[in-house]
Curated annotation (Swiss-Prot):
Gene name of the record: CAV1
Modified-residue entries (Phosphoserine), positions: 2, 9, 37
Disease field: Lipodystrophy, congenital generalized, 3: A form of congenital generalized lipodystrophy, a metabolic disorder characterized by a near complete absence of adipose tissue, extreme insulin resistance, hypertriglyceridemia, hepatic steatosis and diabetes mellitus. CGL3 inheritance is autosomal recessive. Pulmonary hypertension, primary, 3: A rare disorder characterized by plexiform lesions of proliferating endothelial cells in pulmonary arterioles. The lesions lead to elevated pulmonary arterial pression, right ventricular failure, and death. The disease can occur from infancy throughout life and it has a mean age at onset of 36 years. Penetrance is reduced. Although familial pulmonary hypertension is rare, cases secondary to known etiologies are more common and include those associated with the appetite-suppressant drugs.
Intramembrane region positions: 105-125
Residue runs in coiled coils: none
Chain segments carrying region Required for homooligomerization: 2-94
Record organism: Homo sapiens
Region (Interaction with CAVIN3): 82-94
One of the record's GO cellular component terms: Golgi membrane
Lipidated positions per record (S-palmitoyl cysteine): 133, 143, 156
UniProt keyword annotation of Lipoprotein present: yes
Broad class of where this protein is predominantly found: Golgi
Protein name per its UniProtKB record: Caveolin-1
GO biological process: angiogenesis; angiotensin-activated signaling pathway; apoptotic signaling pathway; basement membrane organization; calcium ion homeostasis; calcium ion transport; canonical Wnt signaling pathway; caveola assembly
Cross-link (Glycyl lysine isopeptide (Lys-Gly) (interchain with G-Cter in ubiquitin)), chain numbering: 5, 26, 30, 39, 47, 57
Length: 178
């Protein structure tokens, strides 16, 4: 920790928590505090974002990386005037650039709010509803699986073994008649 910031193994900077004293991440218990000092706790809300590389995980490499050449192409022998081609390129590129910026300015923050709420609800439901339901189901099904296992071993196994012995002596001979 230097200069009031944490640096993780990937080089990301995190600011020091606002409340140093009484912070829930820094217990007052000396043994726990010493143990915790070996592990740095990061505050995800204060990490700095990269304004140059805005897609570090390459989510949109295959989807929205559209340039003029990807959309408009003139085959050999069918070319417009060079000036028209250059003006079309400039018009396409500038329009795409500024219209994206306009849409981002108008709808970026509301969409971020909507997606933030959506993923918060999704996380909440997963943590507080889905996982407990699955755990409860697994606990309840474990009891049923024991009863089912006893049923299979006491009823089904002898029945199918007997049927198998009955049909084990059945022989079929196929002859081809000419």
């Amino acid at each position: 920790m230097s200069g009031g910031k944490y640096v993780d193994s990937e080089g990301h900077l995190y600011t020091v928590p606002i409340r140093e004293q009484g912070n829930i991440y820094k217990p007052n218990n000396k043994a726990m505090a010493d143990e915790l000092s070996e592990k740095q706790v990061y505050d995800a809300h204060t990490k700095e974002i990269d304004l140059v590389n805005r897609d570090p995980k390459h989510l949109n490499d295959d989807v929205v990386k559209i340039d003029f050449e990807d959309v408009i192409a003139e085959p050999e022998g069918t070319h417009s005037f060079d000036g028209i081609w250059k003006a079309s390129f400039t018009t396409f590129t500038v329009t795409k650039y500024w219209f994206y910026r306009l849409l981002s300015a108008l709808f970026g923050i509301p969409m971020a709010l909507i997606w933030g709420i959506y993923f918060a609800i999704l996380s909440f439901l997963h943590i507080w509803a889905v996982v407990p339901c699955i755990k409860s189901f697994l606990i309840e099904i474990q009891c049923i699986s024991r009863v089912y296992s006893i049923y299979v071993h006491t009823v089904c196994d002898p029945l199918f073994e007997a049927v198998g012995k009955i049909f084990s002596n059945v022989r079929i001979n196929l002859q081809k008649e000419i």
